[in-house]
């Protein structure tokens, strides 16, 4: 085994300095990005999110539901821990159960939100989890319109896409900055 005890060359020293400088700059950018993340105002507020959703499994069983989710805001999003739903029209899909809670809505920017790991679990099978990105409108405090596509991964839903589409409005209104 041979060890090279020669001191580093000027080129090696320069490359080491360059690498350290780049690493420091990347670290600063990461800190700056975290500091400028979207925030919700006001935080610590109980809210409801209400709207009409159309759901189906692989284009079948289309059911229209009126849903209300109940949650609490924090600086970075909303955590929903309860919901109710009523069938407005259509097929046999249940409107009042199946959504796996808690459900987290993350504020991405002043015009976009993400539902984190959305999952629907029913007696016929499970769809999800999947992150669902939706447009956000500060003027109306509304997520959507948009469509969640969740992969079926169990029971009769295995290998099929489950869909939920519509808009949901937060009340009292919040702002994402």
Where are these regions (language model features)?
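N-terminal segment immediately downstream of the Sec signal-peptide cleavage site
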Residues: 35-86, 100, 160-177
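Short, hydrophobic/aromatic-rich segments at coil-to-beta transitions
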Residues: 44-50, 110-116, 145-147
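Short, Lys/Arg-enriched N-terminal segments with co-localized hydrophobic residues
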Residues: 1-15
């Amino acid at each position: 085994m041979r060890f090279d005890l020669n001191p580093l060359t000027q080129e090696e020293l320069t490359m080491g300095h360059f690498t350290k400088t780049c690493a420091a700059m990347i670290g600063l950018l990461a800190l700056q990005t975290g500091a400028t993340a979207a925030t919700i105002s006001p935080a610590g507020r109980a809210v409801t999110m209400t709207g009409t959703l159309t759901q189906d499994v692989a284009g079948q069983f289309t059911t229209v539901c009126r849903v209300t989710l109940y949650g609490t805001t924090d600086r970075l999003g909303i955590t929903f821990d309860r919901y109710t739903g009523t069938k407005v029209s259509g097929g046999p899909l249940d409107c009042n159960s199946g959504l796996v809670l808690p459900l987290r809505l993350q504020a991405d920017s002043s015009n976009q939100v993400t539902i984190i790991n959305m999952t629907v679990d029913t007696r016929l099978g499970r769809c999800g989890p999947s992150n669902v990105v939706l447009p956000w409108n500060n003027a109306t405090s509304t997520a959507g319109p948009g469509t969640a596509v969740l992969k079926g991964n169990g029971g009769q839903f295995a290998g099929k896409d489950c869909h939920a589409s519509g808009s949901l409005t937060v009340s009292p209104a919040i702002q994402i900055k």
